[in-house]
Structures are given as C-alpha cells and as structure tokens.
Amino acid sequence: MFKKLHYKVRGLPTPLAGLALGIASLGWCLENALPLAGWGQTTGAVIGLVMIGFLVLRFTAHHDTLWADLKHPVVGSIVPTFAMCLMVVSKTAGHWMPEAGVVLWCAAVLLHLAALGIFVVNRLQEPRLELMVPSWFVPPIGIVVADVTFPEVAVLLPFAKILFWMGAAAYAVLLPLMIYRLFFLPEVPNGAKPTIAILAAPASLLLAGYLTVEKDPSLLLVALLFGIAILMTVVIYFAFWRLLRLQFSPGYAAFTFPMAIGATALYK
C-alpha cells in the first residue's frame, strides 16, 4: 500500500501549487465581498496549505521530479507559485500568530527568490524566444505577492518596496517581448495555452502590491497599472471562449489566481 501511495504521489502535477494559490487567494478576496469574519480567508489558506503539503511529499520522496520541473521551460515557471501560496498562508497565520506569520513570509520570499534565480539560470542556458510562454511572468513578477501579503513590519518595508520595483521593472521588460512572441512567433503549444490566462495577473498584482506598501501612491502609476489590468483582464475573459475548449489538463490551474488577484486589486 505504501509503495502504491509512493508512486501515486510522484504523479501529482506541479500546477497543483498554482491551484492552491488561487484557492487561498480567492478565500481572502471573498472577505472583501462577504461578512465572513475571517473564515473565508482561513478556509482558503487551509485548503491551499493541504494542497502544497502533498507537493512537499512529492518533492521529498522524488527529488528528481523537482529538478526536472525546474529545468522545464513551462513547468519551471510554475514552481514559484508554491512560495506565493505560502506568502498568502502567512498572511492568515499572522492573524493568529504574528511572529509565525512574519517568519513564514520571510521564508516564502527567500524560497521564491531561489526559484527565480534557478529559473533565470536555466533559461539563459537556452535563450530562445519561441520557448517563452505567459507563465514566464510568474517567477519575476509573482514576487510582488510578498507586497500584497506584507506583514506590516516597519523594518521590512524597504525590502518589500524593492521587491515591488523588481517586479515592475521585470514587467516593463517582459510585456513587450511577450506580445511580440505571441503575435509574431509560432503558436504556443496546446499544452501550454492555458497559461495565456496569466496575462491578466501581472498588472493587477502590481497594482494590489503597490497600494499595499505605498502610503502615498502616485496617481499616474495607479492609473497606468489600473488601465493595463482592466485591458488584460477583459482580453482574457474573451480568450476564455477558446481556452475553455481545450482538453482539460493541470494547466487549467492558470485560470484561478489571475481572476482572484484581479478582483483583489479592484477592492484595493
């Protein structure tokens, strides 16, 4: 029985971390719309934590799958959602145990930065623009989840602002490249097409992160991010007409977080 479970765990898809992130974020977002007294956020965080717990089992029992994922041009860009989910969980944990929440937040940020570094190194070894897919936004810009979940510790605020500007700079560089890749290079493979939904996330995430850590936000920057966020979200809603007709795959997890963070940014 243990041997059977051992091999079943090996088959867990890495995009499960993206789904965990989406569920945890959705639970938090629902707190803005419904009088849930914190239970929506807590429920989403617990579900997300259980889901990434299964991935921890997989990575622990099968180290080779983690390294294979990190080297893959698509799956490797999804791995950081594991750390992003932990950041969202840290916000919930902070309500009950503030010190534990800060420690978890710091650990998740360091984990994300490590995944980002590995992703960049692997991609520089094979710098082909046709391999680029929208999930490539996740490693450099997903770090801004650290700003959205910032634990309100004054000494960490400068670091959180640096993380925001890192994400903003990466978006400014990657967005034109991504648009060029999608319009002028070979079509994204069917297996990676669900990641197109991620296009809706970066501007919304940057907007939510900026409004969280900046007490005196620039109206121009807010208007710019808001405009891009709305445009990208509307485009992806129309794209769902085709994306939802694709054969189901774990990549469908890419549909969750972009919608949740878009709603969160609007509430901000």
Give the location of each predicted region.
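Alpha-helical transmembrane segments in multipass membrane proteins, preferentially the mid-helix core
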Residues: A115-F119, V148-T149, V173-L182, L205-T212, ...
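Juxtamembrane helix-loop boundaries in multi-pass membrane proteins
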Residues: F2-S25, H62-V88, W105, V121-V148, ...
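Glycine/small-residue-rich hydrophobic helix-like segments
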Residues: L211-M259
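N-terminal signal-anchor module of multipass membrane proteins
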Residues: M1-V56
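Helix-coil boundary and interhelical linker segments in multi-pass alpha-helical membrane proteins
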Residues: W28-W39, K91-V102, V148-K161, G209-L221, ...
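Loop-centered beta-sheet repeat module
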Residues: P139-F183
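Structural signature of hydrophobic alpha-helical transmembrane segments
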Residues: W39-G53, P98-L113, P158-V173, L219-I230
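Membrane helical hairpin/interfacial module
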Residues: L34-V102
